[in-house]
C-alpha cells in the first residue's frame, strides 16, 4: 500500500503508478511484535517515556520527506547501549527510503571528494552515519549543507553535477561526541543530542538484534514510525 502520512494509518491506499514513487519500505505496518518493540524501547531508553515520545517524533519527522528541523541528530553513549541496534532496525524497516554515509565525511579530516556520496542522498528520508573516531572535529560547511533546506550540490562519478532539495534527516550514532568550535553558533544550533544510557549485557544482549527486531517486529516498528509522523504533523512540526 501507499501511505498518506498526513492521515496516519488511515491514509492507506493502493499503489498507483501516477504517484511516481520509486522507493519502498521493507515491511508493511501492522501490530505483529508490538510487545517486542515496546520492550526494546523501554530497555534502550531506560523506561524514559518522555524520551521515547521525543525520539518517536524525531523518526516520524524524518520520514515525512521534507526538512522541518535543520539539525544533525547525534545518538550518543558508550558502547553496548542499543543505539546501533535501534537506528539500524529503523533504517532496515524503511528499506530504500534509508541510506548510509561514512561518518568521516562529516569531519574536517576528510580529504576525498564527497560529492558522489551526497548524490546518493537524493530522495532519501533517513541517512545513518556510524561511529566517529575520538577527537574528530565536524566540518561546519558540510554539516550546514547536509542539515539544511538549501539545495545540495552533488555529482555522480563521470556524470554532470546537479543539485536537489534535501528530503533527509541525518543521524550520527557514536561513542564519542565530535568537536565543534566554541564560537560556531551555526553548527551548535544544528546539533540535537539524544542520550543512550542503557547498559545491555548478559541475557539482555541478543546477537544481531536489529535483524531479530525487523524479522519479528518490523511491521510494528513501521507503525510506530508512522504514528510519530502523524503526531508531528498534528502538532505543527514543533519538537
Residue ranges and their predicted role:
Residues 1-239:
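Feature primarily recognizes SF3-like P-loop helicase cores of small DNA viruses
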Amino acid at each position: 500500500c501507499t501511505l498518506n502520512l498526513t492521515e496516519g494509518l488511515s491514509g492507506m491506499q493502493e499503489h498507483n503508478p501516477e504517484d511516481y514513487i520509486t522507493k519502498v519500505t521493507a515491511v508493511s505496518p501492522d501490530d505483529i511484535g508490538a510487545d517486542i518493540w515496546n520492550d526494546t524501547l523501554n530497555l534502550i531508553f531506560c523506561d524514559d517515556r518522555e524520551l521515547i515520545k521525543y525520539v518517536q517524533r524525531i523518526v516520524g519527522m524524518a520520514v515525512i520527506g521534507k526538512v522541518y528541523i535543520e539539525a544533525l541528530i547525534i545518538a550518543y553513549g558508550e558502547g553496548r547501549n542499543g543505539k546501533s541496534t535501534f537506528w539500524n532496525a529503523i533504517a532496515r524497516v524503511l528499506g530504500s527510503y534509508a541510506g548510509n554515509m561514512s561518518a568521516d565525511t562529516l569531519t574536517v579530516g576528510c580529504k576525498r571528494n564527497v560529492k558522489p556520496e551526497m548524490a546518493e542522498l537524493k530522495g532519501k528520508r533517513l541517512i545513518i552515519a556510524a561511529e566517529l573516531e575520538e577527537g574528530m572535529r565536524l566540518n561546519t560547511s558540510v554539516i550546514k549543507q547536509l542539515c539544511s533546506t538549501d539545495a545540495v550540490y552533488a555529482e555522480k562519478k563521470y556524470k554532470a553535477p546537479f543539485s536537489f532539495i534535501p528530503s533527509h534527516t541525518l543521524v550520527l550514532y557514536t561513542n564519542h561526541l565530535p568537536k565543534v568550535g566554541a564560537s560556531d553558533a551555526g553548527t551548535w544550533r544544528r546539533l540535537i543530542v539524544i542520550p543512550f544510557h542503557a547498559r545491555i549485557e548478559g541475557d539482555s544482549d541478543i546477537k544481531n538484534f536489529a535483524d531479530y527486531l525487523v524479522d519479528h517486529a518490523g511491521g510494528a516498528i513501521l507503525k510506530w514510525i508512522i504514528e510519530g509522523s502523524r503526531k508531528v504533523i498534528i502538532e505543527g512540526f514543533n519538537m
